[in-house]
């Protein structure tokens, strides 16, 4: 573990880097670096505060980069009685990036399966043990909520509490049922939108035709498509 501490106004930020296995079932195999930022209010860095781990949504988004106690907005109330750990999940932010360039398809699929919620949870457990924390709480937003429920399944012994603000897996339902309901809801919302703004129908159609006929790129270099 490597650490460095910074002190923006109102906060003490300690940045940690942990070396974890790509495949936790093969601890002697290839390694990844996981980045996590510990956040505590100024003047309370030496207190024995309970830990709260934030699991970001996405998947594919890094954790927020706080510059003050109220950024993001949930951070300030959380810091009243917690030491917050903001985790860049594997493949995101300052953790080892996800790179499958040059791999054959089978190797890509085998590598990508190690970037799911189960591996993210095992990373968190590795970090908990490394930091010497007996138990901590987790807060999951969107995809982070799926990570929280996976955490409850795989390592409940490591948790004092679990909070979900979005991303709750269905119970006794197949994911296809959820998507069928989602598509119907999206279609209904589209009808409602165009009923209110009928002139936008031609505008959107023009945009779709342009996306089909032109190679328009996002800042990441990926092509922007209509699908």
Model-derived regions, located:
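Gly/Pro-rich cap/lid or specificity-loop segments adjacent to the active site
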Residues: 2-221
């Amino acid at each position: 573990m490597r650490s460095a501490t910074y002190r923006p106004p109102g906060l003490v930020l300690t940045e940690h880097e942990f070396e974890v296995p790509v495949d936790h079932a093969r601890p002697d195999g290839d390694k990844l670096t996981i980045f996590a930022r510990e956040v505590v209010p100024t003047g309370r860095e030496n207190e024995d505060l309970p830990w709260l781990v934030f699991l970001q949504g996405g998947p594919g988004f890094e954790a927020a980069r706080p510059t003050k106690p109220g950024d993001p907005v949930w951070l300030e109330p959380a810091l009243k009685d917690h030491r917050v750990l903001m985790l860049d999940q594997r493949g995101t932010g300052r953790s080892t990036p996800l790179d499958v360039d040059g791999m054959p398809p089978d190797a890509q699929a085998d590598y990508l399966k190690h970037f799911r919620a189960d591996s993210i949870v095992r990373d968190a457990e590795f970090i908990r043990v490394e930091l010497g924390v007996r138990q901590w709480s987790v807060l999951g937003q969107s995809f982070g909520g799926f990570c929280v429920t996976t955490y409850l399944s795989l390592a409940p012994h490591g948790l004092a509490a679990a909070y979900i603000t979005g991303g709750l897996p269905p119970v006794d339902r197949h994911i296809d049922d959820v998507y069928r309901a989602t598509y119907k809801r999206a279609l209904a919302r589209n009808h409602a939108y165009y009923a209110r703004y009928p002139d936008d129908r031609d505008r959107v159609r023009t945009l779709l035709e342009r996306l089909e006929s032109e190679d328009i790129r996002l800042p990441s270099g990926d092509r922007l498509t209509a699908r």
